[in-house]
C-alpha cells in the first residue's frame, strides 16, 4: 500500500504527535507535510493555499490522496482512522466502551489542551502574542 494519507503539521505539536503515534503504532504508511502553525507565509497554516483546503487553519489535518477526503482536529482524525481501518482494539464498536473513549477524548481536549495552550504557546511562539 502506498502512502495514501498525508498528515499536515509539525512533530513539535502534541496533537500532531498523537496522530503520528497512532499511525506508527499501527504501522500504517503516511506522508508528513510540514506546516508551520499560525504562519501566513508559504508552508503555514494561515496561508491561503492551506486555508483553501482546511478552512480552520489548524494542524493536524489529513488528506486521503485516494479519495480526496480532508479532515482537521486530532481527536476527530484519530476516530476517523480507527473507523476507516477497523482498529477496534483502540476505538471499540461497542457503544458503551466507545463512549468511555469519547469521554476521555473530550475531557482531554477541553481541559488539558485548552488550559495548556495559553501557557505554552506564548513562550514557544512569540509571534502569536
Language-model segment annotations:
Residues 1-128:
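GST-like domain detector, emphasizing the conserved glutathione-binding G-site
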